[in-house]
């Protein structure tokens, strides 16, 4: 429980930031999930498009500090490797 006006304000700001961050994180998870599904189905074009969307979402989230930059890079790298494997199989 906040005792001062400034502490109450910081609490309000933290709640707003949390709501925004949750929304961004949810979008990233959805994009990555769609990319993984497209990759497992083996459709090269769909996998490429879904990968691009997921990579863009991860980059944006990492630039905002929602996802750590190394974690974003690792996920992008793994998705790229899987997408390239699907594209090479065709």
From Swiss-Prot:
This is Small ribosomal subunit protein bS20. Keywords: Ribonucleoprotein, Ribosomal protein, RNA-binding, rRNA-binding. NCBIfam families: S20 (TIGR00029). Residues 1-29 are annotated as: Disordered. Belongs to the bacterial ribosomal protein bS20 family. One of its GO terms (cellular component) is cytosol. GO terms for biological process: translation. Binds directly to 16S ribosomal RNA. The keyword RNA-binding applies. GO terms for molecular function: small ribosomal subunit rRNA binding; structural constituent of ribosome. Gene3D superfamilies: Ribosomal protein S20 (1.20.58.110). HAMAP family: Ribosomal_bS20. The gene is rpsT.
